[in-house]
């Protein structure tokens, strides 16, 4: 039984209404939980506002919400919504939002029974020093003010072990268009691999490129191809690396891709390969998993929660280990299909309806 109304933030810093949170909002709309959605005036990609308007979701737009300025003005607007809608629980997505809500709760409204849920999306996790500092600062804020903290993977929950019972494990969902009724056919010639990610430090596309070059030379592989969609400060450096290694014709750089374009790349491939130092969740892990692709990954994000090495995926800890994985799968391509089939059969754990059921259950427990 629902006990009150939820205020759900659907936008993030410098992004506006995000694609991910739009999917979550649409799933929440199908549940019995009553909510009010709030967002900044911008959107991550064109069409997100129309998607939710088409199904009758009204989002309160607060100008400047996703810019770190005008704190008092934003807090007053949020306080008005909480008061007018009799909100009993607020779900925030970043540190700026939780500070605004804490100010509303304790200073503007003095509504001490207002519950706060926080989703951990990131914490400078590709920089060791910044990661430690961020965990300490964020952790202190969450210990003091959050009632529950959603961690999207066991990997992330361990990073914030000191939150104790406040931390709950609920994964993210994946967009409905990734849930195909039948297992899409896997390419059967060579390793067709994809890693969608920003080109920045910590994503390590260079490790994949070098390992791929070594594999091609070692196995005389004339069939395989690597796709690296995304953009960022290191993209030109990665392109140069492929030329230096003589594999420029075997690696494609499609640039920024929409969700639908990334989906089409996955369907051209039989392997999702991940090289990140760290992921809080790892959509780049889950998307190929849901589509029934083999997943090759470092031990980050949700990978250890869903992959068993040598069965439905493969782990590696170094460039040389990645070369060995490439060689093994190239010479035993039946293993790619076996892993893909296992993953496709487990895909429903990431359907938004199933994730939302757990999420609404969390809210109900807060009101008991």
What are these regions (language model features)?
Residues 277:
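Aromatic "clamp/platform" in nucleotide-sugar-dependent glycosyltransferases that forms part
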Residues 8-23, 27-70, 159:
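N-terminal strand-loop element at the rim of the active site
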Residues 309-310, 314-320, 328-333:
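Conserved acidic donor-binding segment of nucleotide-sugar-dependent glycosyltransferases
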Residues 294-297:
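Short hydrophobic beta-strand element within catalytic cores of glycosyltransferases
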Residues 256-257, 264-269:
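Short alpha-helical donor nucleotide-sugar binding micro-motif in glycosyltransferases
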Residues 7-9, 186-203, 209-212:
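Conserved donor-binding/catalytic core segment of Leloir-type glycosyltransferases
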Residues 92-98, 120:
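Short His-centered aromatic/hydrophobic patch
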Residues 155, 173:
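Carbohydrate-associated surface elements
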